Amino acid sequence: MSRLPAALRTYRLLAAVAGPLTPVMLSRRVKQGKEHGGRLVERRGLARLKRPEGRLVWLHAASVGELASVLPLIARIAERGIGVLVTTGTVTSGGLAEQRLPRGVIHQFVPLDVPRFVRRFLAHWRPDLALFVESDLWPNMIVEASTRRVPLILINGRISEASYRRWTYLLGTIVDLLGRFDLCLAGTQGDAERLSALGAPRVIAAGNLTLDVPAPPAGAARLAALQSAIGSRPLVAAASTHPGEESALIDAHRRLRADFSGLVTLIAPRHPERGAGVAELAAAAGLKASLRSRGALPDATTDIYVADTMGELGLIYRLSPLVFMGGSLVRHGGQNPIEPAKLGAAILHGPHVWNFAEIYAALDKSGGAAQVDDGDQLAGRFSAWLHDDTARERAAKAARETVESLSGALERTLAALEPYLMQLQLPRRTDHA
């Protein structure tokens, strides 16, 4: 590549200068529960494990959602006998990696985007191919991998309208970064057009891999126990909620319980460590809340059941006939609606869903989902669907059929990756530099 743009040079300089300050920052994040205290060395580019022999694909997925979307892809690559290293950046994604990665696939927390940390990481793992998921584009990681001539591919690529507008103010930087990618596989046609406009040289609209991920599992015993505890009481659920949304849900519950005796509202905060705070909000509103993390099941007096545990959304989506998807009444961009749609739930969401705009648009158009703009509309739609089983079931059926019609991204992605994966299975002619 030619000389780096000024903004990118400045970023690299500041990141290098910040390197000595990272121990203090990481220590603070450990106290906040945002880092794995026993694995901080990985954030500085050090490895706990040896590099496996042979060719190695490095796949980077920022967090839980991104990792979940590529689990089937990881399995298909590993089945070919190619080594796979997966990096993620959050404690919760590390937990998911431990639970769900195929045997033999290595997980490491991604190094902070400090040049010497990234170089240390690359020198140890020596990847033969790098796959970046969605939009987690760390400049030093991309520049250093490109400098080592590692082929770079963006998979499930996503650039929202808001991100696109922001990047236009740093056009030279994003053109440089995307120009280092051999291939960008976009999640939607809109993403493909935005990636091309920002300088990606080769873009294919392969589709959203999340649509091909199997529905999340639910342990039969746990499902039966929770179903038994709730019994025939009316139930609504809210998944992956963010601060500011739980108060609207609690207020909706207070307004609805007069019409729906025994109503249970199940709230699964996006970050489980916020569970106790959600319970306090309910108590302040005069409602009784119980926390799943403490082993509680809802009893006859429970109003708000807080599912502050990891890996149980599959259970929640199977239980609740209708689900509000969080991150959408507040300006977060929305959470992924595909899993509840696959499991037969009618879906509600707020207006702020730019992270999954095209999927929500398809669901809304088919009647599988409905938008609510505030707490009043949320309570009203909950009430309408609780009163009308036929309308709710029709919406759930439309949601399921919509996501089924949009599937196929996994095979298209594998087809696009085939030349690169085939190359890794050929005898090595020279050692990796």
Language-model features, listed with the residues they occupy:
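Nucleotide-activated sugar donor-binding and catalytic core shared by glycosyltransferases
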Residues: 1-433
